[in-house]
Structures are given as C-alpha cells and as structure tokens.
C-alpha cells in the first residue's frame, strides 16, 4: 500500500540554559494512505512533540535535528520555509488538539473559525460559498442545529460539541492527513466513543489518513 508520510530518524532537542534536552530520539514510522497510525505512550514521552514536528510547529529553543527526515508524498519537509509550512498546514495536513476550549478562539463565533481555514487556502471562493462549505462540514460532524451552532461562541457549547467543531475546522479543507493529539482525553467515555466513531466515518468518506496520539490503548 502506498505511503503518504514517512518519518525517518526524527530527533528533536530543546537547547536550554542547562544544556541540550533530548525530547525525541530517532523515531521512525510511516502512515499509509487512507489508514490510521497510532502513536501510543505515557505522558511526557514525546508524542505531542513528534506531532508538532510533522506540522513545522517546533518553536525555539526547540529544534528538529539535521539527521531527521519527514517525507510527505515524496517531498522532504524538514527544509521548508515558514511560508511553505503555512501552505502545508491546513491544506495537506490538519491537527485536532486535546483541549478544544483552549484551542478555539473564545472571541470568535464558531462559523467564523471554521471559515478562516477556507479563506486561507481557497481564496477564490465567495463569502456565500465559504459559509455553505463551513456549514456542510459542521453538519457532517453531527452537530445538532448546525446553523445555530455557527453563530455561537465556544464557551456556549459542551465539551463534545467543541471537539466536533475542532474536527470541522481541521477537515473543512479536506486534508490528506489528520493528526489527532489526544482528541478524547478531556471527554467522558460515551462522548469519547462518539468522537472516535465520527473520525472513522469521516476517514471512510474522505479517504484521509489519521495519526492518533494517545496514552490509552482502549482508544486505539
């Protein structure tokens, strides 16, 4: 089966006043097209740092070491400029974070936040087309009353609904790869199962690949 992403010898270090701290050392894995890969480990083992590396989100004093290779559809990403990363993020690869309340902008309505990704990557769309695409994506995530939800702020929604909104924000541009960083940790067991089922359904419908990051083998 064709590989969408190949990670070879990924190493990430943080250079602090106390010297070099190795966060990730020599990890290698690949992600097949249309399939799910799970990164499983205890808290603090470097799972989220690995995910951020794949999105070009390692900030100083952190650094992806020169021997690392991140190959996406045959292209080496580690040498990307910030402009190239901005094009890659959202269009080719999106991320769902652990805590939607922290990740979503509390001052912006849900509809505007979903539409923002479309505006950044599909500038040829009209205002009405952006609204309709955002609404359709929200409908696909199973949010009740999607039209009403578009006009709400994140704090007005339950934890499960916020996570669905996060998935809609990530998926509205139909990326090839979705990175889900502990997407169900902050949710109760019933809602956890619903979110996992939703991700599986969208994967089947859109043909995307998923990297799921978790410490819970039950989720895997």
Regions found by a protein language model. Give the residues of each.
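Conserved ABC transporter NBD signature motif
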Residues: 65-76
């Amino acid at each position: 089966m064709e590989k969408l992403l190949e990670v070879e010898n990924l190493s990430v270090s943080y250079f602090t006043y106390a010297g070099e701290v190795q966060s990730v050392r020599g990890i290698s894995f690949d992600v097949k097209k249309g399939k799910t890969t799970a990164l499983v480990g205890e808290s603090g083992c470097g799972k989220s740092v690995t995910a951020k590396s794949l999105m070009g989100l390692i900030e100083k004093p952190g650094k992806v070491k020169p021997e690392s290779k991140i190959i996406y559809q045959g292209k080496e990403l580690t040498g990307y400029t910030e402009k190239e990363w901005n094009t890659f993020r959202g269009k080719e690869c999106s991320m769902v974070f652990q805590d939607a309340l922290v990740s979503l902008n509390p001052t912006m309505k849900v509809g505007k936040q979903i539409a923002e990704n479309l505006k950044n990557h599909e500038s040829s769309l009209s205002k009405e087309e952006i609204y309709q695409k955002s609404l359709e994506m929200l409908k696909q995530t199973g949010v009740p009353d999607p039209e009403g939800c578009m006009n709400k702020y994140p704090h007005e929604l339950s934890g499960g609904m916020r996570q669905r909104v996060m998935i809609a924000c990530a998926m509205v541009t139909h990326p090839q790869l979705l990175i889900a960083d502990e997407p169900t940790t902050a949710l109760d067991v019933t809602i956890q199962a619903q979110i996992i089922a939703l991700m599986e359904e969208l994967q089947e419908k859109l043909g995307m690949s998923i990297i799921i990051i978790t410490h819970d083998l039950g989720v895997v």
